[in-house]
Amino acid sequence: DCIPGGENCDVFRPYRCCSGYCILLLCA
C-alpha cells in the first residue's frame, strides 16, 4: 500500500501513489 503523494513509493524513481498502488509517472 501507499499514501497519496508518493511518500511510501520508490523515492529514486518517478513513481506516484494511485488508488493504493505505486505506478510510474502519472495516474491514468
UniProtKB/Swiss-Prot annotation:
Tell me which residues bear 4-carboxyglutamate.
Answer: 7
Give the signal peptide range: none
A GO CC term assigned to this protein in UniProt: extracellular region
**What one GO molecular function would you report for this record?**
calcium channel regulator activity
> Does the UniProt entry include the keyword Membrane?
no
Residues recorded with modification 4-hydroxyproline:
4, 14
Q: Which domain of life is it from?
A: Eukaryota
Record carries keyword Cell inner membrane? no
Q: Which UniProt keywords apply?
A: Calcium channel impairing toxin, Disulfide bond, Gamma-carboxyglutamic acid, Hydroxylation, Ion channel impairing toxin, Knottin, Neurotoxin, Secreted, Toxin, Voltage-gated calcium channel impairing toxin, Voltage-gated sodium channel impairing toxin
Give the UniProt subcellular location, in the record's own words.
Answer: Secreted
For this chain, the annotated S-S bridges are: 2-18, 9-22, 17-27
Q: List each coiled-coil range.
A: none
Q: In which tissues is it expressed?
A: Expressed by the venom duct.
What free text does the record give on domains? The presence of a 'disulfide through disulfide knot' structurally defines this protein as a knottin.
Q: What does this protein do?
A: May inhibit sodium (Nav) or calcium channels (Cav).
* Name listed for the protein in its UniProt record: Conotoxin de7b
